[in-house]
């Protein structure tokens, strides 16, 4: 992988990480402030269950799959073939 390809991959990974972070904050705000004051299935207020239990679990799963699909192992060695330019 050339140095240019490494930078492109790093930029792609950073974009995904930033997008997921922004999406998480938006999801947390929606889950915390939109539900009515009702009790959730496990006994906590619904807003708490959605924003502090279910949403983090969902994003852990999403993050795991993004790491498996999008992210790549990149060698940190500069002496790789094609990096001399």
Curated annotation (Swiss-Prot):
UniProt-annotated location(s): Cell membrane
Signal peptide feature range: none
Keywords: Cell membrane, Membrane, Transmembrane, Transmembrane helix
Mode of membrane association: Multi-pass membrane protein
Positions of transmembrane segments: 16-34, 50-71
Disulfide partners: none
GO cellular component: plasma membrane
Protein name, as recorded: Uncharacterized protein HI_0974.1
Organism: Haemophilus influenzae (strain ATCC 51907 / DSM 11121 / KW20 / Rd)
